[in-house]
Regions:
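Conserved SAM-binding strand-loop segment of SAM-dependent methyltransferases
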Residues: 44-51
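Class I SAM-dependent methyltransferase "Motif I" SAM/SAH-binding loop
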Residues: 5-10
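Conserved acidic E/D residue at the C-terminus of a beta-strand in Rossmann-like folds
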Residues: 28-30, 109-110
């Protein structure tokens, strides 16, 4: 299954997904040091450096899962919390790429401040944007300490499945029934 990694950093999403059988087909990361690390670990995988210039037609293979930890500075309590008025507010660019490549799954990650900034309207925009494109979404808040980190910073996770591919629930039930009946293929 193919993975497109936006706002890649040093490739955490790709590393995790690689361990369960996904193939990263492209990265988008602007920081030079991160791009150097990505290039070293994922030799031959295309690295785009500007989300604003990345177009869906640039991605030649189908995308099964698209991930992205879009910039958190507009929402972080450590920053000025300018929300949509911050130059680093790049959700609209990530959403544009989602619409263009039409992945089956998306996973987005950000700081907890995303939920509250501008009276919750930014978080609502992210969720309603995805739903308007036919995604069933679930949101989670997971503290970093919950997965073994030595701090408890809470992260917001948004997981979506494209309803254009049929109901995820029915696929899970069908798969479970195949396994249960001993007919797993």
């Amino acid at each position: 299954m193919n993975h497109l990694d936006l706002f890649s950093g040093i490739g955490g999403f790709s590393l995790g997904l690689e361990k369960v059988g996904f193939k990263t087909i492209a990265f988008c990361e602007r920081e030079e040091y991160c791009r150097m690390l990505l290039q070293k670990h994922w030799k031959g995988v295309k690295i785009y450096n500007d989300i604003k210039k990345l177009e869906g037609k640039d991605i030649k293979e189908p995308v099964d899962i698209l991930t992205g930890g879009f910039p958190c500075q507009p929402y972080s309590v450590a920053g000025k919390q300018k929300g949509t008025n911050d130059d680093r507010y790049l959700w609209p660019e990530m959403f544009r790429v989602i619409k263009e490549v039409k992945p089956t799954f998306i996973i987005a990650e950000n700081v907890r401040g995303l939920i509250n900034i501008q009276d919750g309207m930014v978080f609502e925009t992210v969720c309603s944007d995805l739903e308007s494109e036919g995604f069933e979404i679930q949101t989670f808040i997971i503290p970093a300490a919950g997965v073994g980190a030595p701090h408890k910073r809470e992260r917001v996770w948004i997981v979506g499945y494209s309803k254009h591919n049929g109901s995820l629930t029915s696929k899970i039930k069908r798969r479970y029934n195949e396994v249960d009946a001993g007919t797993q293929k």
